[in-house]
Curated annotation (Swiss-Prot):
Residues 1-9 are cytoplasmic. One of its GO terms (biological process) is protein N-linked glycosylation via asparagine. It is an enzyme of class 2 (transferase). Residues 505-566 form the SH3 domain. Pathway: Protein modification; protein glycosylation. Pfam families: FUT8_N_cat (PF19745), SH3_9 (PF14604). This is Alpha-(1,6)-fucosyltransferase. It is a single-pass type II membrane protein. Catalyzes the addition of fucose in alpha 1-6 linkage to the first GlcNAc residue, next to the peptide chains in N-glycans. CDD domains: Fut8_like, SH3_Fut8. The chain crosses the membrane at residues 10-30. Residues 209-496 form the GT23 domain. One of its GO terms (cellular component) is Golgi cisterna membrane.
Amino acid sequence: MRPWTGSWRWIMLILFAWGTLLFYIGGHLVRDNENPDHSSRELSKILAKLERLKQQNEDLRRMAESLRIPEGPIEQGAAAGRIRALEEQLLKAKEQIEMYKQQSSNAVSGLGKDHEILRRAIENGAKEFWYFVQSEVKKLKHLDRNELQRHVDEIIIDMGHQQRSVMTDLYYLSQTDGAGDWREREAKDLTDLVQRRITYLQNPKDCSKAKKLVCNINKGCGYGCQLHHVVYCFMIAYGTQRTLILESQSWRYATGGWETVFKPVSETCTDRSGSSTGHWSGEANDKNVQVVELPIVDSLHPRPPYLPLGVPEDLADRLIRLHGDPAVWWVSQFVKYLIRPQPWLEKEIEESTKKLGFKHPVIGVHVRRTDKVGTEAAFHPIEEYMVHVEEHFQLLARRMQIDKKRVYLATDDPTLLQEAKAKYPQYEFISDNSISWSAGLHNRYTENSLRGVILDIHFLSQADFLVCTFSSQVCRVAYEIMQTLHPDASAHFHSLDDIYYFGGQNAHNQLAIYPHQPRNAEEIPLEPGDIIGVAGNHWDGYSKGINRKLGRTGLYPSYKVKEKIETVKYPTYQEAEK
């Protein structure tokens, strides 16, 4: 028997499974497009709903007529009976009105939460299956050299075409029936609501009486880390109903403080003075302390529930329906408020946009070298990033005209731009090498370096897709800002290492939805309902984590779990709506 015969059968088995999955998903997604009467039926349904609403309105009018109390004297017994009948009719009318309101709301407010969860599950499942097939088929290359390797390469190319076809169908599905417009409206409504609440909290009428939480920006780390430190402070201030006082004088990046770069976090209350002051000792213990000083998250004890990755209980259903990663969306709202630029910075961004020729379509690539490599992250050559850049441009080409394949390259390695241009002449690289020089360790804590990192983050967040390492705070900040620019940009990235995380976050848990029996010593068993503490995604179809019920750590198929959304009882700041 030829050495690759068994392997080839295995490849055909994978192909069959993949084809079956595509046929099943694609059949469901394109069925409507194959039916020429679909639009007509949908229009008929809408007209029928309008007719029902018209009839229901007439029913209510007649009910209102019957509720009119007749003029003139009536007997007491008859009056009592009439009142009881009126009460029953009023109750029935109230129930019907609520039902009609709900029906009307469903008719105009877009698709249901379950539809959106399912859409994202299909998208994620297809991606995870693709990671798996890529990984497993690539392994077969080493079993033989000639014909097998050629077949494997062809399989990967063909499967890539099919995967992009499914992803394109999913994109168009997400825009059908007014769903795209609904997402835009809902994202704006939620953002406006949260920003009003934050603004209310940060601008008390009487600063001398306001409860305050003091946060010092000078944590011993870089800009992205310091920004996340302030976000952590802000989230706890919001949860404990305290105005955030940001101490930023003698900031390592700008000695004039935060307000010289971004707008003040408050217009009415920047004074930390109060009748009593104390260090954080827990929300309940600090109840009667007016001014509380917060430590860095590493030293926080006791830990309140307001840390990421929790989301507000009162917004959770809307966020789950709207966004693929509600926890990131929630973090992004605090980032949005904090980084409102001063006029000079806004002008600097506009001028840099014109100078660099930044325009769409463009993919953002962030390559972190210097201090991260060898300590917090592994070295990744430019080729690893460009694989995912090319894949996404091929996907974009399915739904738009690509005039040029532009890449915004942000890096702290000044030599990388020329290397990238030499290796990939078919791409247009947009980059400011002076920023790379200023990002070096010897120049890092300067105002010029601050300007550079802010510009890099801005352009990365503006890109159509982001390829980076989530071990880098700069990359995660760009991803967070990206969420404020789109209704749902949760899938607009590929990380070469970590999944998204927030330093100091509470446990990141997933919920098993399918059983799994380990096939080797590296894997762990799953049963539906098991809670898995996720450590990371290997981007090959498998994730690593701990089964909290069994206490076992290992690998498991990524598609067999879903995110466990943690909700937190945050204050709702009803006063902000008055």
